[in-house]
Structure formats: structure tokens, C-alpha cells
Amino acid sequence: MALPIIVKWGGQEYSVTTLSEDDTVLDLKQFLKTLTGVLPERQKLLGLKVKGKPAENDVKLGALKLKPNTKIMMMGTREESLEDVLGPPPDNDDVVNDFDIEDEVVEVENREENLLKISRRVKEYKVEILNPPREGKKLLVLDVDYTLFDHRSCAETGVELMRPYLHEFLTSAYEDYDIVIWSATNMKWIEAKMKELGVSTNANYKITFMLDSAAMITVHTPRRGLIDVKPLGVIWGKFSEFYSKKNTIMFDDIGRNFLMNPQNGLKIRPFMKAHLNRDKDKGLLKLTQYLKEIAKLDDFLGLNHKYWERYLSKKQGQ
């Protein structure tokens, strides 16, 4: 059962409508972090008591006997800028921690506070256009780490860690798609990786622009807590005359990155242990064919990219 709460902080009131009596005080604090930027450990919620004592983080909201739309006061200082708070966590093996996003989608995709964050990115995030968008082209958005190359293995050059057929894949895709790179890292590292791989200097294709972690947003999921995602709405908002849900596809090895846009995401198999798999991995070859097939369509909304291999086999069998 939903338990609407109004939280006052910094002269403003924040409406919390997505938590239930089964959620905990910590869930509330984590949600408030997404709204205010104040870290949970810095928050003090006045009026939340159990048996006369301040409620601990593990106490369920139902135990507080709150009436709907109860107003509570939050004290706490935002010690970091909002952008820092919303940025990605320190580097870890996201592939191990990935989860199936399907059950979370309905609760997250259209939530008002997430859409407001996207609007803020559209207004504030600066995109450096490397090559102008082309009229009539579809959009391919690509992750970098484990999608285009193995960023964990050691090698003398980046080329040794590059996913097989990368340049052939991008050359073919460029015929039908504008290409955008989006990585959950700092722009200077993205630029360095693209240069090392020979992507930014290849004469056979061009990159339209690149996005870094500052274009991402943090969303709260009821069961998984806070996660960072890549909302395609940032691109659609900035380039609405060229790109939309109908003509965009995004490749990423981490499914939760397209939690805000599940219809447009294709979860690619991660490319790891390059020295062992360099001669075996043919993922980009097959995806080259898939992109070529769906480029014939006027609208991608009828596709389910989860079954892209089935779709490709069916088309090639005709």
C-alpha cells in the first residue's frame, strides 16, 4: 500500500508518493537523496519515532503509523554539488552486479522526478558536435567498456583489446546511422580510448558526438536502490528534429543503463579476456547484419531487441 509523505527541506516541500509501508527509513533517505542531493548518512528526519525514540534505518515505514501526506522535516547539508552526487560510483565490475531490468521498468521509466532530471540534462549538459547529424539517418548509441573493447585486460596497445570487427561494424553502421558514443566515465578518458582504438580518426565513418557520465542520471528503484542510467531522452531532447524513440537503438553490456528506455536497448554480450576470445568473438559481425536489416524499417517501436538473433535468423531465412 502506497504511503504518501511530504518532506520539508531547504525551504521547499518534496512529495514522496512511490514508497509503501513495506519500505524502510533507509529507502526513504535514499529516495530523498535523489531529490535533494543530501547523502543518507547526512540526513536527520524529525518526527520519525518508534516508541518515543528516533527510528533506525531498518524500521519499516508502516511501523511509524504515519497518516497519508504527513509532513516531516529533514535536516542535513548537501556537501557535494548535485552533479557529483548523481555521478557514477567508483569503478567496479558492473557486469557481475547487473540485473534483469524488466520488473523495474514500469515503476521507473515515467516517474516524474526522473523526467525532471532528464529535462535538467537537456538544458544544462553541453554536447560538442564532432560531425553534424545527417538528415534521414537513424541513431546508434554505443557503450565503450566491454562493448567495444576489453578495458580490464592488460596489453601494450588498445588495439589488442579491441573487439573483433569493430571498424568493419562502424563502417557498415555509418551508412544508415549517425553514431554516438556514451560511456559512464570522464570525457577525457573517452576521447583517449577512441583515439587509441583509431575510432575518432577513421576515414570510413564519423562519430557525431560523445557523451560522458555527466549526461547520466541516478534513479531509485524500489528493490535495487539507487542506480545510474543513460536516458536517451537527453539526446532526443537536444536533437528532436533528428532522433526519437522511433529511430534509435542503443548497445550496452549492462542492461540497467537503458532502464529509462528499455524499448530502445539491446544488451550486448560483454567482450572480456581479449587474449582468449579475440579469435572467437563474432558478436559485432552478427549485429552488423541486424542493424542493416532493421535500418529498412521506418519505426523501431515494433521490435524487441531482446530477441534480435531470432529476428535476424528469420529475415535471413526468407
From Swiss-Prot:
Alphabetical list of Pfam families matching this protein: NIF, ubiquitin
Binding site for Mg(2+): 143, 145, 253
Record bears the keyword Nucleotidyltransferase: no
N-acetylalanine modifications at: 2
Enzyme class, UniProt record, top EC level: hydrolase
Major location category of this protein: nucleus
Residue positions, PTM N6-acetyllysine: 117
Gene Ontology MF, one: protein serine/threonine phosphatase activity
Keyword NADP on entry: no
SMART domains: CPDc, UBQ
GO biological-process terms attached to the record: regulation of proteasome assembly
Catalytic activity: O-phospho-L-seryl-[protein] + H2O = L-seryl-[protein] + phosphate; O-phospho-L-threonyl-[protein] + H2O = L-threonyl-[protein] + phosphate
Residues covered by the FCP1 homology domain: 133-294
Keywords per UniProt: Acetylation, Hydrolase, Magnesium, Metal-binding, Nucleus, Protein phosphatase
Functional note: Dephosphorylates 26S nuclear proteasomes, thereby decreasing their proteolytic activity. Recruited to the 19S regulatory particle of the 26S proteasome through its interaction with 19S component PSMD2/RPN1. Once recruited, dephosphorylates 19S component PSMC2/RPT1 which impairs PSMC2 ATPase activity and disrupts 26S proteasome assembly. Has also been reported to stimulate the proteolytic activity of the 26S proteasome.
Protein name, per record: Ubiquitin-like domain-containing CTD phosphatase 1
Organism: Pongo abelii (Sumatran orangutan)
Lineage, broadest ranks: Eukaryota, Metazoa, Chordata, Craniata, Vertebrata
